[in-house]
Amino acid sequence: LAYGQRPVDLVNPLVDSANSRWFFFTSATRPFGMVNLSPDMGTAGAWESGYRYNQKTINFFSHIHAWQLSGVPVLPTTGEIKAHLGPKAYGSAYSHDRETVEAGYHAVVLDDYNIKAELTSTVRVGFHRYTFPKSDQSAVILDLSAQLGPSGTESGYVKKVSNKKIKGYAVMEKTIRRPKATKVFFAIHFNKPFEALHAFKDGKLLGEVKEFEGEKGGVYPVFTTQQGDQLLMKVAISYVSMKQAELNLNTELPHWDFNAVVEDSKNQWNDYLS
């Protein structure tokens, strides 16, 4: 170690990220965290999905990368809504030159949308900070029909709680090794109000909704942003209930200090590595 360095400063999450599996890569997560938040370039196949260093498009940011399980994929966008066309349409180009990958923190610029996305987490809550350009139609896509590795999203449910909160669940379809479908419950909070909650289903935009339920669809809250506006988003998960997801969020992340969570995550990683 050089003077002033800590073990956590030497961690390189990108090692073996060109040809690993969807559940190997770890960046914006805690040691043994239930949330394992990171970008996904590949979506299908046991060896062709998750964070793939040499692939050129980020499809979404998923909160679960586990053996036979994934889920709760999101992506911020600007301009024309392409959520109903799938991740191959709404995904974004990026450059490793504008990416920072560390233990407990991941930042990358989505070139198609000129959005800087920063990710960190607590054990059960993914924490996002998005820096937007000026746009009359900024959005955050929650795709409840996405595939990652062998784990596809069978269906989902979302309810608008307020103009800053939504809740729901994703039903992850069974796999060869996980013979039953699994519900992933979530609670999502924003630090700023969204103007409306919209939905998509079966390749079509449905317009504004208060609730969504079904297959092959999802939702996207929309915002108007000015240059440099920062939107913070918390995504808590539970395998028990929506109420438990809300409890996890309020217990683990009652504040909006993103930098403090990054620092706390790094300290926890350093403790494990020391």
Residue ranges of each PLM-predicted region?
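Accessory carbohydrate-recognition regions in carbohydrate-active enzymes
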Residues: 5-274
